[in-house]
Amino acid sequence: TGIYYTDSADKAIIETTLARAQAFERKPFAIEVLPLDNYYSAEEYHQDYLDKNPNGYCHIPLGLSQEPLIDDSAYNKPTEKDLQTLSPQEFEVTQNAATDAPFSHELTDEFKSGLYVDITTGEPLFGSSRKFESHCGWPSFTKPIAKDVIRYYKDNSHGMQRIEVRSRIGNAHLGHVFEDGPNGSLRYCINGSALKFIPKNELLGTKYEYLIPYID
């Protein structure tokens, strides 16, 4: 399998995207990233193939996707005025990478059905179906509601080697991700102060309503 580019500036974007996807997989990808040196037009039968054949062999209905598409244009990076609405602890956690004291936040023991969003932007981050009791003292999830909403960074602070997770639009510090989740999964260890929880029954009639099938 390969990804081929015509503009050398695209190479870094492709490699960054692959690195983010690789974080969700244990086996290394076997995907080459190379300049496009040869290109041949397909025969007429395959021109505009899916327009001519809506149920064609290479068509995958979006409705079968296991995770939703989160439109990044629907959310904005918070302004200084927006950040002033945060509590002192929420500000310290999201903006200065502070950490909630273990077992101190109410969302640690929240297990109702609903959606967890970035407290600084409202961007969806986690669904309740992926939350589990980790007994570590912080809200824990096996995966985000969609891969693209999380950013990953190496964190060597405090004499440890960890992977920090931040929100896509707000660049808010969320917590860290570890490899000790249930049944070989990951554990996203998230500060409750970085999250806002919206119960399932409050999603109806909002811009989040389409996400209901992905939180149960």
Give residue spans per PLM region.
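Flexible coil/turn and secondary-structure edge motifs
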Residues: T1-D216
